[in-house]
Amino acid sequence: MELSTAVTLIKEGVTRSREAQVWADLGAGTGLFTMALSTLLPDGSTIYAIDKDRNAMGNIVIPSHNVILKKIAIDFVNDPLETEHLDGLLMANALHYVSDKLSFLKKVKQTLKSSAKILIIEYDREKSNPWVPYPISYRTLEHLSHDLKNASIEKIGSTPSKYEANIYSALLSFN
């Protein structure tokens, strides 16, 4: 995926503000969406790139020198998130590694400010494979959001995937 496509998928979910924001990118990998997010945040913002693969994160370089990047090598599914209260959480092709999505989302909600949101980018599929062990289609995510207290979900983008299903982006907000 090109950086411009990643930016297009998430831009509607990032708050436009002049005030610095704090975000975490769970399952950051090599940083494509971390880089995309950095182009949308105001100066002085912080992004925590979180992934269990320290080597994958090794080459993450964000284009904006005015956004602070902090890399944390942990298993975001099982380890506690030790970040400051977040304005936003980005999960690009990461939620499909979580088997108990409801419990996980309830857990990460505790790291968010009350006005924060979760940006989710996933394959719109139900059938698992070795690379997508616990898939979550947008329809399933909609149903899951009903089980979260005071949550709303909105599909904000989609793009074709070279691996079968389309990729969607969704914004999960808490009222």
Whereabouts are the PLM-identified features?
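A short SAM/SAH-binding and catalytic strip from SAM-dependent methyltransferases
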Residues: 87-101
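Class I SAM-dependent methyltransferase SAM/SAH-binding core
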Residues: 24, 29-79
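A short acidic, Gly/Pro-enriched loop at the edge of an enzyme's catalytic core
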Residues: 77-89
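Conserved alpha-helix/loop element of class I SAM-dependent methyltransferases that forms part
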Residues: 1-21, 36
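A short glycine-rich, Lys/Arg-flanked "PGG" loop and its adjoining helix->strand segment in the class I
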Residues: 102-117
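C-terminal alpha-helical "lid/dimerization" subdomain adjacent to the S-adenosyl-L-methionine
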Residues: 4, 39, 117-171
